[in-house]
């Protein structure tokens, strides 16, 4: 079959509870469900005022973040970037990143390439309390 169709909300498991912190964090990974070969795709709904408790960087993967609803901020290395609805941010491999939702929450699609295969954790380094005020 030359295509795969899935519904992010209905077909993909919410793995948000695997992360520390906010009970209302929603995180759905579409890469395997869509049988993606060259890229990865994820969806996140972050509750108002929540900041991820860690930052992360990738050795090989470039990521694109698309703000679907709400707003917030991203920290990219040492720079803070404001996010609004329909903003798109490309993040190069090797760049540290973290994000927090504004008062309306933050809904984002995350697209990454190349696809990291069966063990995506081999490409990522995370650091707890990376973004401290």
Where are these regions (language model features)?
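A short, N-terminal "cap"/entry segment at the start of jelly-roll beta-barrel domains
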Residues: 1-39, 47-48, 54, 121-133
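A generic "binding-loop/recognition-motif" signal
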Residues: 60, 79, 95, 104-105
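Short, charged/polar surface micro-motifs in flexible loops or helix N-caps
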Residues: 36-39, 47-52, 71-73, 80, ...
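Short acidic-glycine-tyrosine-enriched beta hairpin
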Residues: 78-94
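Short beta-strand His + acidic residue motifs that chelate non-heme Fe in jelly-roll/DSBH
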Residues: 54, 74-75, 91, 97-103
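Short, conserved beta-strand element in jelly-roll/cupin
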Residues: 43-47, 57-75
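Double-stranded beta-helix
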Residues: 3, 98-133
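Residue-level recognition of conserved beta-strand positions in structured domain cores
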Residues: 43, 76-78, 93, 101, ...
């Amino acid at each position: 079959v030359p295509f795969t169709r899935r519904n992010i909300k209905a077909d993909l498991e919410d793995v948000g509870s695997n992360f520390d912190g906010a009970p209302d964090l929603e995180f759905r990974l579409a890469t395997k469900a869509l049988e993606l070969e060259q890229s990865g795709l994820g969806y996140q709904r972050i509750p108002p005022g929540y900041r991820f408790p860690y930052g992360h960087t990738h050795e090989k993967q470039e990521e694109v973040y698309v703000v679907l609803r709400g707003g917030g901020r991203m920290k990219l290395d040492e720079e803070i970037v404001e996010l609004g609805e329909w903003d798109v941010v490309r993040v190069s491999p090797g760049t540290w990143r973290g994000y927090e939702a504004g008062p309306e929450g933050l809904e984002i699609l995350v697209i990454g390439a190349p696809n990291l295969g069966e063990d995506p954790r081999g490409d990522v380094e995370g650091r707890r309390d990376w973004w401290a005020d």
